[in-house]
Amino acid sequence: QAKTIVVIHGLTSSKYSSGVLLASGILYKSGFNVLAMDMRDHGDSTCEDGYYSAGQKESDDSAAVVDWLVNEKNISANKIGIYGQSLGALTTLQTGAKTQNFAAIAVHDPPVAFETLVREEMEFQGFPPSLYTPVLHYARIFRGENLTEVTPEVAIAGGNKQPILVFNGMLDKRVLAHHTDDLIKIANDNGVEITTYRYEDMGHVESLWGYNEEFGKVIVSFFNENLSS
């Protein structure tokens, strides 16, 4: 079986988005199997309730896809990688809390602390960051969901030290650059190998296009080195 990459889109996006198609095409042309998935309430997947659960349920979806590759397609876990963009990168990082059937992950402008992300987004939109607290309580009381239960830190700490590749646009105004700093610290604290490519002139996931040639070379090399032949 060829090395296989699961590709995960961002919020309100789908497997048909230009970013997912571009990254998937690069990987496919380089000899990888590619499975671009739709998270629940996105694209062709079931519309469960129309709510985004900060990766809590979405990581169930990514874990189910990875486990399906192992259990139904007989692809060894050491041949499977995951690549996610934006909030799909958050889901990618959370997947390790649900399954260990993968060997490496790559993420593009990943949020790491969801609470911080929401507060920053509220401020960006002109709302008081303090509104996050009632949103969190609403999710717990009326939706029965703890939006901060499964975090990248929890997943990485309990994982198999799968290496991480990060692409980060330093001009990102939606997922601020400190999230990548936080991820680097989490990885280092847990003895996980992490490689970062940071771009001072790029915004949110823009380096996929602005540094497309470098992106292709780096991600292909990363997965070839960290997935078994």
Language-model region placement:
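Conserved alpha/beta-hydrolase "acid-adjacent" motif
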Residues: 173-179
